[in-house]
Each structure stands twice: as structure tokens, then as C-alpha cells.
């Protein structure tokens, strides 16, 4: 008699585009799934400017997760490019993951209600299954959750709704299963040990920009960009990185440098810690600050930044 062969588990793979309002926790979720920091996170909205691609690989699945800039009403050239990047990602997606901050409904319900038509407009553009992740439920009381689910259910027929907390990890395994079961059967596109297709140069520039966001106020974070001028790897010594921080005005340059260079020194030291963790080796980082008037409207610079 022939032994009955055990069927091999089907392999699922595809693209999940993560969209949603600014500061909802999209980058935090991606970093949690990858168990490492490839997307920067700050308390400020519109931190993410570029599309970040994370690769989440399991025994029988591979998710190519696109972390996109937050959807918002854009007026400036750079902001319009950010929204364009987010919406274009939907064209590549097998699944759209709409990530919303559930706690916003309890903190500023009128503000969320005013965005009803805006959210509906974005979601009407989606041509694939759409999963809703209600993030930050760790900030809610249990009785607050159901009305929030009802509100979001009224704006779009989501394929699934998953309450979760990207920061605490609650519900993230459930969300992952929901995504995997809806992915098509397909091949493994990337090796197991590849967490992203972003270059180390790009991630380093983002880590520096994150430190600027965390240490400056008002318009300063939104008026800065980071360009990596050189990235030199040495077999025996530290990686040597030279980077330029662009600002739009001379007054902003003074703020970033700080008294006796203290602010710039603090930014550099904090960035080096994360860069060394990323690269797994010692790093030496040199930073310069340069004024480039109206760079946020300069298409050549925006292209250089990948926007």
C-alpha cells in the first residue's frame, strides 16, 4: 500500500499597503512586525515622508508591507507628494490596511467626524479587500470600543475590523492572521533574513531626521531634510558617515546647531546610537547644516529625497 502523502501548506504572499491619517501608528506597527527599527517614529504627525517597504516572512507567508505617509489635506508641494505616494501604493496592493487611531474618537470626536467624507473619499479609491486596524486601544476603556467600531463601519464596508495596540502588541497577532488569510497564493519574493529593501543610507538619513523631530519644535522638523553625502565602510574601523541637514532659513540653522553647537551635538549622539544598532558596528557621524531656501517646493531636491 502507498502511504498517503501529507499535503504541503499553501504559501501566501503579496503586498499590504498601510494607509491612514497621520500619527495613527503605521510605522510603529511595521517596526513591531519586523522586530527592528526601519521606520522612524515620533509623536508629531507627518513624520513619514517616503514609502517604507518592510518584508515580514513566516513559515507559510511573506507580506510586503508598505508603510506610507499619513493621509491629510495637502497644500505645500512636499505634502502633496506625500499624499500621492500613499495613494499610489494602493495600486500595487493585494490588501489595503487602513490604520486608525481609535483613541482619537474619545479625545477629539468632532475632529474625527469632520474627516468622515475625507476618509470615504480615500477608501472609495481602494480596489482590493480593505482591513481596518483600530490602533491604540490600550488608551481606551472597554465600553468605548464598540461605538468606535460602529462609526468606522458606517463609513466603509471593511473586510475585517481588528482592534489592536501596535505599541503594546495587543491584537497584532490577530491582525497578522487576518492579513495572511486574505493574501493570494504566491512565491516567496525575498530571502528570510531580508527585513526591507530600503538601503542603509536611506535608513540612516531617516534616523537622523527622527532625532531632529524629537528635539526641535514648531515648524523646524517640517523644514528639514537629511542628505547622506558619503557612507564609507572600513574593514577594521568604524563606518564613517557624512550628512547634510537642509533647512529653509538661517534662523532654523541657528536653532539646529544650538548654543556652542549643543543641539547639533545632541542630535548626532542620539543618531549614532541608533545607527550603530542598525549596522551592528561602530559608526562615526559628521553633520553639517545648510540653508536651502524653499527646498520643500524644489522638485529636484524632492526627487533626490525620493519623493
Model-derived features: positions:
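Conserved C-terminal guanine-recognition region of P-loop GTPase G domains, centered on the G4
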Residues: 57-62, 81-161, 232-235
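Canonical P-loop GTPase G-domain recognition
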Residues: 128-129, 138-196, 200
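Catalytic P-loop NTPase motifs of RecA-like helicase/translocase cores
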Residues: 48, 72-73, 106, 140-141, ...
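Conserved G1/Walker A P-loop phosphate-binding module
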Residues: 2-91, 95, 100
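Conserved, well-folded catalytic cores of nucleic-acid-processing
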Residues: 36, 55-59, 74, 89-96, ...
Amino acid at each position: 500500500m502507498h502511504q498517503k502523502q501529507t499535503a504541503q501548506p499553501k504559501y501566501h504572499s503579496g503586498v499590504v499597503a498601510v494607509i491612514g491619517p497621520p500619527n495613527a501608528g503605521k510605522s510603529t506597527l511595521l517596526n513591531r512586525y519586523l522586530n527592528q527599527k526601519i521606520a522612524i517614529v515620533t509623536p508629531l504627525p507627518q513624520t513619514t515622508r517616503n514609502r517604507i517597504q518592510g518584508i515580514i516572512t513566516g513559515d507559510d507567508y511573506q507580506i510586503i508591507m508598505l508603510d506610507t505617509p499619513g493621509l491629510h489635506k495637502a497644500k505645500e508641494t512636499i505634502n502633496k507628494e506625500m499624499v500621492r505616494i500613499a495613494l499610489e501604493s494602493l495600486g500595487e496592493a493585494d490588501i489595503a490596511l487602513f490604520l486608525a487611531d481609535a483613541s482619537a474618537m474619545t479625545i477629539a470626536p468632532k475632529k474625527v467626524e469632520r474627516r468622515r467624507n475625507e476618509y470615504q473619499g480615500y477608501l472609495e479609491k481602494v480596489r482590493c479587500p480593505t482591513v481596518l486596524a483600530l490602533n491604540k486601544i490600550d488608551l481606551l476603556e472597554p465600553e468605548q470600543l464598540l461605538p468606535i467600531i460602529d462609526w468606522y463601519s458606517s463609513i466603509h464596508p471593511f473586510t475585517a475590523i481588528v482592534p489592536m495596540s501596535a505599541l503594546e502588541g495587543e491584537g497584532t497577532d490577530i491582525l497578522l492572521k487576518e492579513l495572511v488569510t486574505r493574501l493570494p497564493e504566491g512565491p516567496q519574493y525575498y530571502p528570510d533574513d531580508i527585513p526591507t529593501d530600503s538601503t542603509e543610507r536611506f535608513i540612516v538619513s531617516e534616523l537622523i531626521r527622527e532625532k531632529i523631530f524629537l528635539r526641535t519644535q514648531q515648524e523646524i522638523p517640517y523644514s528639514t531634510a537629511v542628505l547622506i553625502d558619503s557612507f564609507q565602510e572600513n574593514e577594521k574601523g568604524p563606518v564613517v558617515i557624512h550628512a547634510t541637514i537642509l533647512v529653509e532659513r538661517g534662523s532654523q540653522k541657528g536653532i539646529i546647531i544650538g548654543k556652542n553647537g549643543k543641539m547639533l551635538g545632541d542630535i548626532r549622539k542620539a543618531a549614532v546610537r541608533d545607527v550603530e544598532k542598525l549596522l551592528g558596528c561602530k559608526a562615526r557621524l559628521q553633520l553639517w547644516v545648510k540653508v536651502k531656501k524653499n527646498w520643500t517646493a524644489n522638485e529636484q531636491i524632492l526627487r533626490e529625497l525620493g519623493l
